[in-house]
Structures are given as C-alpha cells and as structure tokens.
From Swiss-Prot:
Function: Specifically dimethylates two adjacent adenosines (A1518 and A1519) in the loop of a conserved hairpin near the 3'-end of 16S rRNA in the 30S particle. May play a critical role in biogenesis of 30S subunits.
Main location class: cytoplasm
Gene3D superfamilies cross-referenced by the UniProt entry: Ribosomal RNA adenine dimethylase-like, domain 2, Vaccinia Virus protein VP39
UniProt GO MF annotations: 16S rRNA (adenine(1518)-N(6)/adenine(1519)-N(6))-dimethyltransferase activity; RNA binding
Catalytic function, reaction form: adenosine(1518)/adenosine(1519) in 16S rRNA + 4 S-adenosyl-L-methionine = N(6)-dimethyladenosine(1518)/N(6)-dimethyladenosine(1519) in 16S rRNA + 4 S-adenosyl-L-homocysteine + 4 H(+)
Subcellular location: Cytoplasm
Keywords: Cytoplasm, Methyltransferase, RNA-binding, rRNA processing, S-adenosyl-L-methionine, Transferase
Protein name, as recorded: Ribosomal RNA small subunit methyltransferase A
Amino acid sequence: MQKPVPKKHLGQNFLKDRKIAEKIVENIDLKNKEIIEIGCGTGFLTNFLLEKAKFVTCYEIDRNLIPILEKKFKNKNLRIINEDFLLAELEFKEKKTIIANLPYYITSKILFKIFANFEKFDKIILMVQNEVADRIVAKPKTPTYSKLSLASQYIAHVKKLFVVGPDSFFPKPKINSAVVFFDLRTNLDAKKTEQFFWFTKKCFQFKRKTLYNNLIFFLNKQQIEKIYNFFQFAQNIRPQQLDLVTYIRLADFYFNNIF
C-alpha cells in the first residue's frame, strides 16, 4: 500500500499513537452513533471509530489520500467525501457526533463553522493545539479568555480531556496538542446564538482596549452610556473581565433596547 506523504501546506500531522486513539474513543459512547470525522488523514483514528460507531462520514481535502483510504476501508461502514469541510453543505437532519484531529492553522475557522451549525451536532471531540484548548476552556480574568472561550462555552459544556505530545504524530509538530470535549447544549435559539456570536466578536475586536473602546466602533456615546448605567460597569472595564452570563445579558440588552 502506498505510504501517505504529509503535506505541510495542509497542516497535516498524522496521528500514529494507538493509546491516544483508544483514549479518544473511550471518552464517548459511540454505539449506534453516526460520526463525522474532519480530515481522516491515514485513517488511523478512523479505524478505531469504525470498530464502535454505527457509521462514519469523513471529509478529506487531500485527494491523494482518497484511493489509499478507499482501499484500506473497503466494505466498511464509511463514506469518504473529498471536500473541504469549510465549504461543505451540511444537509443531514439527524444529529451527528464530530471527532477530529484538526490542522492547527484552520482550527478556529472549523470551530466557528461547527458552531454556526450547532443544531446538527450533539457532541464533539477535537484534537487541537494545546494553546487553543486552553482558550476554549478559559475563565474570565485570565490571559487566554477570548471570543473563542465565550463561543465555545455558550454552545456547549466544554472540558479539556488530556494533553498529547509531539511524539504521537508524524511528522512531529513543534508544540503539544490537547483533546477537548464539547457536550452541546440543547436549549439554544438559532437567532439568539447568531446574535451572541456577532456581539461578542465586536466586544473582543481589540482585546487590549477597554470594553468602551471596543463598543465605540459600532455604538455612539449615548448608547454606550445606556449600557454602562444599566449594568453599572466601571469605565475602565475590559472585555476579558466579564463572564458568560453577563455577555448573554449584554447581547440581549443590545438587541432588545439599542439595535
């Protein structure tokens, strides 16, 4: 069988550690589950998913890997789609579970694509850059707290499961990875979710600035004063000082009283 060659421009670091693959699969009940895998690479993790899941659909952008995967998994409960997940139309109706080892350079884009389609998924397990994992689970008033933290925690109950070292991949990345679990919330409103993402993105547009100096880019002084008076904010408060519940209330206040 032809040996896959990792492509640097696609950010390919193929998982090769059996213990890590087993650990990922052990963290979720895959029985009768239909799985979406984003970028199955050599099919290393795919093999473990197929052992337990009902069906696996894999989005793989690298066309050179397709014949290798098709030969490796012939007659398996697997559908391989040679397409960029970021461009894919997600037309399925029943909720799926996503499990993936994501390329570092497009992690945020893929996350926000998933978040924009939150109604189509129930659980997500992702291998990401360790630094990104820390941002996903970050708490207010910490250096890693960001719009990604808010979006992730608005959409789901999130948990950083474990760190994965460079030796678990080929080729070895220069940094650690981590596996993060998302248990998606079931009571979300699509319109309010979209509004929340938009509003928090605006609030974190310039992270080094105060909240006021972020809001001034899309609100006038009177509107900001109305917000500050209602929430009794200090003038110098910064975006990273406010928790998720406050941002939910802020977004609701903006769209109900100002927008």
